[in-house]
Amino acid sequence: VKWAWDHMIQALSLQWQFDISNNSWGAIDPFSDNFNSTSLTFGWVALRKGVEDGRDGLGTSFVFSAGNSAGSGDNTNYHNFQNAREVITVGAANADGTMAGFSTPGANVLVSTYGVGLITTDRHQPGLGTQPSSDYENNFTGTSAAAPLVSGIVAMMLEANPNLGYRDVQKILAYSTTHPDGQDWKENGASDWNLGGLQFNDKAGFGL
């Protein structure tokens, strides 16, 4: 496990050189990715370097999948990579816009998007993998599938306005959402110019 974390941290430490860093991975056990542990302290350092030095000071946008362990009672609050303020944590929704039952909830889920039955390329060469007769997969499912969609949206945002900071990106995503059905929403107070707050849900974040 330490070997895996060491290599993951090493990869993260280089992400400040990129505009967007998609991270479709996460720890399974609660608190196993604690930044206070010696081996993971540099994980937070890598995130800070990304938002402080990435994109010439505007900040790298780190996108993380929320996790697929809602059924076991997991919560993104238990995972430092998902609950770090430097990241965009993404939940998964079904094709009909309702939230996927497996999507891990938490107070730090920013937004959600489709993450069930997506079409993508197969991971293996022809003749191998889960789709041996095809180069495509039509059942890419999980918050790991949802996160890259948000990363793509962020890429289009930065193409339209290269001067956006990483916090601008987070705020625009939150303000651009709609509310999926079947969720209870809480009012989230704000100190904006019009004192207007948003509605939030632990499963969907600010919305879809």
Predicted regions, residues:
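Catalytic-core regions built around general acid/base machinery
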Residues: 35-61, 77-86
